[in-house]
């Protein structure tokens, strides 16, 4: 045990650090939860947390988290009322599946329960031994750092933790280990925190591979029958991605669209994964955060901790391990600062949707003590009570010249829009920022909503497959194909599985239109599917003809009626040469990859075969 705790050191140094004056404080008294007329919002006059609080995800008062500046007060999970009424995650187990968990860390040891697994050694201690394997250990602190007046505080500080190092570089990832970590040993209402997989996103990947199908089935079964919740990171490649020896990013003159659309990763288009993207301390999308129609919620993720606040959380213990170490200096004032953290057990630079995901996990845990709620009930409550951030966010428009010479403008990605069921949705924020205090009282009330029953599935039928039809050629005017849903369902989400041929996939805008007229961008143009261009440059031939069973998910139609005609639209919105900037990581040299326009039109092959509306009986809504 350290002689000087981080919490005490922060208290002693407050006069020297430009931290906002409104801080959590020791006079912040417990509440019963029965106080009449109490304002539990983010601007409440009684908003506070006990102790000295450097954690803007729990209570953002504008503090700087040891970075040069603070954020905008109120952009947090709004959980102060839940914590002060002793809703702290008691009796809930969380499995963190990633690259390790230091089970002896002073902020985590009291919350670690038996059942962890080190896949490398076969033992029960998944503590990382590689000094660079730190991100997911930091994740555990965001969820479950215990309230011991030593260091940081987790969203659910009395939750129980297990760790599985499935993403350790020293192992072969076997399907049996994934199935064990994600599916077996589950207790009722056990959130499973899924990793942010670092997969290549330059080539499309179908969702019908055996491994993906097995995991999809597992997630469905455990969610439906064992009340397990799976929370997944949207990705951190809004502006650039790593692909082999290169870092690729769009040319600087393109409209500000996401390079990585979160739907490109097939695990992100699984309905049973609740996909989360990150906001920063100013209450807008974190600069790195991937977005897409599959995003369900937003949660704090921060920036990099050097220019603006990141997360303050646990680090691998010791000054030669993790983020906070003597051989890796940082401008974040927590790092290499013996007055604050002599043992280097904490860091102030954790960020990413890998931070937003544990924040959401902890928030769901705080709803979990109510066993009558299904996981879909919890999702419904979180969506309907989320806060609409960046409310004036508008669409990103694309201008292009059609084949007939006409100038056209289309929406490459929507801003905030209200669907036909009256719910606000944005692919950049999902339904909005998690609000624990607003949601938690609703979770105490008996649920009569249809989300308490089994999920209903509607398949489309109609003209979704006709490879030889001339109307299926993909050009500069929308190629439209429709399918009919006859079941009277209320939509929770829609999945489509698209197959098409095209020589330059980043040119394509793919949209889905509901019977109510709501339009959702499933895949934006100017995206990261540049594998065809890289192949031509490096191999002289192309391995990818187009999309094959690429699954995409949209939550934008939540609450709308499913009955009626659904329409897929595919448009080629570029006919000039396209450019991608490349950084060769071996030589640190930069180049520009230039690709001419496709020499022949694309062709939509199929989409209704994998089309599904997931929802519930409209009569029960």
Curated annotation (Swiss-Prot):
Gene3D superfamilies noted in UniProt: Galactose-binding domain-like, Peptidase S8/S53 domain
Signal sequence, start to end: 1-24
Record region (Disordered): 114-133, 457-485
Occurrences of domain P/Homo B (ranges): 454-619
Keyword list, A-Z: Hydrolase, Protease, Serine protease, Signal
Residues annotated as catalytic: 98 (charge relay system), 137 (charge relay system), 354 (charge relay system)
Domain spans labelled Peptidase S8: 68-440
Gene Ontology molecular functions: serine-type endopeptidase activity
GO biological process: protein processing
Function according to Swiss-Prot or TrEMBL: Agent of furonculosis.
Protein name: Microbial serine proteinase
Species per Swiss-Prot/TrEMBL record: Aeromonas salmonicida
